[in-house]
Amino acid sequence: AHELAHQRGIASEQECNFLAIAASLACGDPVYRYSGALMGYIHLGNALYRADRERWEKLRSELPEEVLADLRYHSAYWSQFEGLTATVSKSIYDTALRSYGQSDGIQSYGTVVDLLIAYY
């Protein structure tokens, strides 16, 4: 859904992330709804972790084991891209986003949290 939003002419990464989550949550297919909910949780959970780790830990402790397993899988998948290559790639991508008019660059991904909170 994120890439489809780009194809529809939305350049902003944060708006595409938000629209992908919102569209997935509104979908009739429970797999898509779960995917949207999980991505929303990841974005919101990361923000909560930075703001209030104790509250994040309480919330996380209440998640079903199946959800925790999916979160571990998600984390393991993305951790394989950590290191020098990831650092260089992020720097290049940040520059590209700024050249497309996104003044926050790669930090613009955090704006999805503000959009989710405002919408829901």
Regions found by a protein language model. Give the residues of each.
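Generic macromolecular interface patches on structured domains
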Residues: 26, 30-33, 51, 102
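An active-site-proximal "capping" alpha-helix that borders the catalytic cofactor pocket
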Residues: 11-28
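Pan-zinc metallopeptidase signature
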Residues: 65-120
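Catalytic glutamate of the conserved HExxH
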Residues: 2-7, 18
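Acidic/histidine-rich catalytic neighborhood
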Residues: 34-65
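Soluble non-cytosolic domains of exported or imported proteins
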Residues: 7-14, 31-35, 83-86, 107
